[in-house]
Each structure stands twice: as C-alpha cells, then as structure tokens.
Regions:
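A short, well-structured edge-of-sheet supersecondary motif
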Residues: 1-8, 227-228
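Preference for short coil/turn "hinge" residues that link or interrupt alpha-helices
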Residues: 7, 13-16, 100, 116, ...
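Short active-site loop at a secondary-structure junction
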Residues: 7-27, 31
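Gly/Ser/Thr-rich beta-alpha loop segments that engage phosphate groups in nucleotides
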Residues: 19, 190, 313
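Conserved serine DD-peptidase/penicillin-binding transpeptidase domain
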Residues: 31-302
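Extended C-terminal subregions enriched in glycine
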Residues: 298-314
Length: 314
C-alpha cells in the first residue's frame, strides 16, 4: 500500500520555470508587511527661494514593476505643485535599494533584447521596454508605419521594412544590443500588423532620461544631465515632494495572470529588503527567505536549488 507501481526519473531535479513565481509570491505574501505598496518617491535636500530650488532633486526607486507613462506624468504633476521653475542643483536617481546586477543568475545573455528579460533596477519605467507596433502600408512595396510606446528621445528607430514584399526578407525586431545601444531596428517584409516588446539598455537611465525630459516639458529648467546617488535621509533639509504608490494586488495580478518575470523579481528584491532591512539587496537575500518558508512547511531546503524569483534561469 502507498507504494509506487512505476517511477520514471522520480529523483530528477527539474527546472521550475514559471512555477517558481508561485514560491516567490507565496513567500512575499506571508510577511507581515506584505500589503505595503511599491513606492516611487521624489525628494529634495535644499530650499526654495525666488522660484528656484537651491538644492538637489532625488528620485528614489522602490522597484515598482508597474510604473508606466501615466505614473511618470502623475509623479511630475505633484513635483510641479511646488513653487519653483528652476533647479539650481543636480537631479539624481537613487537606486540604492538593490545591487547593480541587472539580470538574474543563469539568465541567458542572448535572450536580450526580448521584452521578457528587462534590465532590473529599483527605477523601472514601462517595464524597461518599448512596445513597437508595425502596420503595413496600403501600397505594396512601401515602407510600413512604425509607432513606439512610451515616447522618449532615449532611443532611436531605424525602419527598414517593406509592405507585402517577400524579397525584403523575414520580418524582425531587434536592437543594437551587442554594443548596449538603443537603436531599434525593424526590418523585413510586413504582411500584417505586428507588435512586440523590446528591452532597453539600461533601465534606470531610461527612467531618469524620461523624467528630466518630461520635467522640462512642464516648463522646469533642469540640469542638462542626471546622476545616481543615495538620498541623504539624515539631512535636516530633506523633504518629500511626491510619491507614486502601486498596490501589491496590481503587481500580483500581472505576476500570476501574465507570468511576468519583472514582477516576480520585484517581489524577490522587496522580500529581501523587508527581511534584512538593508540597502543594496541581492537576489540571494530574497532566496534565503524562500528557503526559510520551505523549511517551515516541513521540507528540506537542501532538496531545492533556487536561482531567481521568476524561473527564467537556465
């Protein structure tokens, strides 16, 4: 009784693939602070005098994987309610929540520039990807129409398509990823509407470039460039100017309904940050918490090898 009649590779360890997302989500939701939203904040460390912010502006990333174009606009609308139109200082992105490794352990380098493998950062804008839509012309042989979302001057587009022209070659989306460039190349024969997501290098710079671009669009005079630095929270002058919150439920829905790799990694990073209370969190900090839950459930963590939060690892 209770004995197997036949086994085949019963002891073989298999890749979890996207079922890994279940372990990550369950562990994250088991924590007391599980319902804390994913936050993106803007702070300054100076004073506002005569229409000028005398000090630095900081955008503090909380690894919100659902921060999109609308979120960016809403954050900026809050910032411009403050009585200044000139920033006499620097604009910084604070990505100190996480270490600098932008891919998970065992992720395939040649999966880039696929949208399902973005460059991970506490500052994510539109999932670190651009959605490209290609529509054939009404005239055979004409160049197809290409549109991209979100709009940003951070990337460029090269359109080498032909409408319903077989000798134009196989249709393809790509990016000059071998040189970490952000020129999106769309080429080949377009016989019908095509859509795809392409990742952008690199995510925090994509975020900050677009943030400055849209601030200027609202009439704010900003520095020409941005940098990366940690918010000096112990300074008496620091003040929060704006905050965007994304609910855990929204992040979870995208994770479980759409099997979103980015959302799983965001949960893993936040899990590590909540458990350790430290900065520069590594994936291993979150994985340790998953292993602890496995033990609490009566299993031996030594029977499992966990490499990331989403199951993309090879």
């Amino acid at each position: 009784a209770k004995k197997s009649l036949y086994n085949y590779r019963a002891e073989k360890l298999s890749r979890p693939a996207s079922t890994m997302k279940l372990l990550t989500a369950i562990t994250a939701l088991s924590r007391p602070e599980a319902n804390e939203p994913f936050r993106t904040e803007v702070w300054h460390d100076g004073v506002i005098e005569h229409d000028t912010l005398q000090g630095n502006l900081y955008v503090v990333g909380g690894f919100d994987p659902e921060f999109d174009s609308q979120s960016m606009d809403s954050l900026i609308e809050e910032v411009i309610t403050f009585p200044f139109s000139v920033i006499n200082g620097q604009v910084y992105g604070d990505v100190s929540m996480k270490d600098s490794l932008y891919w998970g352990s065992g992720w395939a380098w040649d999966d880039t520039p696929a949208g399902y493998q973005p460059y991970l950062s506490p500052l994510m804008f539109c999932k670190g990807t651009v959605q490209v839509s290609v529509v054939p012309s009404t005239v055979q042989g004409d160049t197809a129409s290409v549109s991209c979302q979100p709009l940003s001057s951070y990337y460029t587009v090269t359109n080498q398509t032909k409408t319903r022209t077989s000798f134009a070659g196989k249709f393809s989306f790509t990016r000059d990823w071998l040189t970490n460039g952000n020129n999106l190349l769309i080429s080949g024969n377009v016989a019908s509407i095509r859509k795809d997501d392409v990742n952008i290098y690199d995510s925090p710079r994509f975020f900050m470039h677009t943030f400055l671009e849209r601030l200027r669009g609202k009439g704010i005079t900003t520095p020409q460039s941005y940098g990366f630095a940690e918010l000096p929270r112990d300074s008496v002058r620091v003040e929060r100017m704006a905050c965007w919150n994304t609910s855990v439920q929204k992040v979870l829905n995208q994770l479980m309904k759409e099997s979103d790799n980015l959302n799983a990694e965001a949960f893993l990073c936040r899990l590590g940050a909540q458990a350790t209370g430290k900065k520069q969190v590594a994936a291993e900090d979150g994985i340790v918490e998953i292993m602890k839950l496995i033990r609490r459930l009566g299993h031996d963590p030594k029977d499992y090898k966990i490499a990331d939060g989403c199951g993309l690892s090879n």
